[in-house]
Amino acid sequence: MKRTLLILLTGLLLCPAVAQIRQIDYSGIAPHPRLFLQKDAEKAIRKVIRSDKGLARAHFAIIDYSDKLLTEHCLVRPESGHILAISREALKRIFYLSYAYRITGMVRYAERAEKEMLNVCGFRDWDPEHFLDTAEMLLALAIGYDWLYDRLSPRTRDTVRTAIIEKGFEPTYDDRYNKFYGMNSNWNQVCNSGVICAALA
């Protein structure tokens, strides 16, 4: 009897919370892309590139690197050890390729970025024991997912979302991996930034 009463009371207490969840209005969330460069930011960038030599050099360096990536092999996760260098290279590749697509409109950059994203989603994990590695990977996928959203297939979107949740978010609930929450170093900022950007994407 006591157990039945406890279950009943718990259910009654949760009903308002469930009802509140159902009433969340998502219509106010900005459409993709919403991270760093919003829709139509490309026009302003193209204009600045024509008048600012320094920014033009940076732009063409990104395009050149993106062109080289088109024939590069995808990244490989080492069998052991940390993967920070791999995560940072994934971030660089996905960020540059996504930028190149948004500014030039050339589909080959988006297609290669999608290939890079699916590749890292296939890693067994993103080294949550050294959560900096995971955070960099989260940021990489957040940018690619958000900036290329309209170009990605529904299957790719689902794969990326699942990887972000399982390999990125779930470890943050595990005390073995979430020490960064209490750190006073840049780990706190970098790790939280990766998690937040992935959540916003």
Q: Across the structure, where does each feature detected by a protein language model lie?
A:
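General helical structural elements
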Residues: 6-7, 38
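Positively charged n-region of N-terminal signal peptides that target proteins for export
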Residues: 1-4
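Aromatic-lined, polymer-binding surfaces characteristic
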Residues: 26, 34-50, 55-63, 67-201
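Bacterial N-terminal signal peptides
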Residues: 7-16
